[in-house]
Amino acid sequence: MAIDLHKQGRVVKRSVVRQTKSTNVYHKLLIKLYKFLVRRTDSKFNQNILKRLSSSRLNKFPLSLSRIVKNLNETNKEQVIVSTSTVTNDERLLTVPKLTVCALKFTETARKRILAAGGKCLTFDQLALKAPTGTNCFLLRAPKSREAYRHWGKAPGQRGSHSAPYVRSEGRKFERAHGLK
């Protein structure tokens, strides 16, 4: 026998983000468009795009040009690289190959370098017209973890806590136990 959680007055949380917190009208239109595409096509690609577009800004990690180039190979060289975040420039990358990239935003220098190499910078509405089911598209995401996450969670020093304290220095005399006297 199972418990009827709703009857007991317990709150059952939804695991899926239903609506975006963004107030940007264009962003909301994109979500509306991809909701339509998810409903009309049986494409997992569109479901992924919709989920990532609906995620919070904190979870849209910027993707650098060097990471895009690093993930290129012979099979996906002609494909459209898709990212639901900002594409940023990387000055350590000396040459940029010809790319077709679709993203929410591009930094000014990243856009210049892609266009100078003979590539294209697409928006999501252009991608929906070009590939409504996501054929010939390669979905990329930046690494999710950030240095800031080290400090979140239980307070440092509490039992069971693995979070790092905010300290001005990490030397011998800072935030270290001096031992018993």
From Swiss-Prot:
One annotated GO molecular function: RNA binding
GO annotations of cellular component type: cytosolic large ribosomal subunit
Region (Disordered): 152-181
GO biological process, any: translation
A Pfam family annotated for this UniProt entry: Ribosomal_L18
Record's subcellular location: Cytoplasm
The family this protein is said to belong to: Belongs to the eukaryotic ribosomal protein eL18 family.
Protein name per the record: Large ribosomal subunit protein eL18
Organism of origin: Tetrahymena thermophila
